[in-house]
Amino acid sequence: MEKREKKNDSIFQHRLERHHDELRWLYMELYQNGDMFAELCSQMYEYYNCRSKKLKERDLKREKEPDWYHGKDMLGMMLYTDNFAGNMKGVKEKIPYLKECNINCLHLMPFLDTPKGRSDGGYAVADFRKVRPDLGTMKDLIELTEKCHEEDINVCMDFVMNHTSEDHEWARCARAGEGEYMSRYFFYDNEEIPEKYEKTVPQVFPTTAPGNFTYLPETGHYVMTTFYPYQWDLNYRNPRVFNEMIYNFLYLTNQGIDIVRIDAVPYIWKELGTTCRNLKQVHTIVRMMRMIAEIVCPGVLL
């Protein structure tokens, strides 16, 4: 047991050493916060340790075959769990059918917990660590990914980075006036800054959800809502937001996810006087995510 732990530690340390300097440089460029970077590295080690033996073996294999996803035999299927099979267990039962279709990449459309009637098709996430109850549980997801892996099927999911649901724990605390959580979003107590953003930021849904801000009368603040009023934009200028979203990302990959489609990523960095689309900081954040994945879960494709 001790030898195995030392081997695992050495694998992690080797990967960390390979990326540490660039990762730290990029992190400090955005955040200038050494304590938060140290916390990030510590948590990366914890999530690596929580990764199952089978997933670690899968990582090692894919490190040796980094172009595993380039094969001409790769064939994917994208589906909504409820429409296809009712729930996660139903999808698991239909794996023989997927094999008959020669499917080796299964893209599950958003399945995390969302508020009923305000879900935006699953893209208004209320809890990044909970499956929507009618679809199953995290245990069901793990059982599905394990069975898929046994049948050489990769599992893909969407990771919503730009925003959370207004029902997310952070948003509820922010609505209650807790400054720590208000700083994780874009809150303004008057129209001055929102109006400046509106001059340069295009509208995503000008007909169904006009504008990029929503006024909350109970707090007396405007909150940035690029998509729908119930989807609050996260403030990636706050290192706590970046760190916590990375922890959510690593938690999900530890459930057996092979491929992560980052949703709405062009929007995640906001800068007054710009369109707030595809800014250079977005690419810095995605690069850091890729390096973190290569350290903790290199078998996962972004």
Task: Give the ranges of each region predicted by the language model.
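Receiver (REC) domain switch/active-site residues of two-component response regulators
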Residues: 258
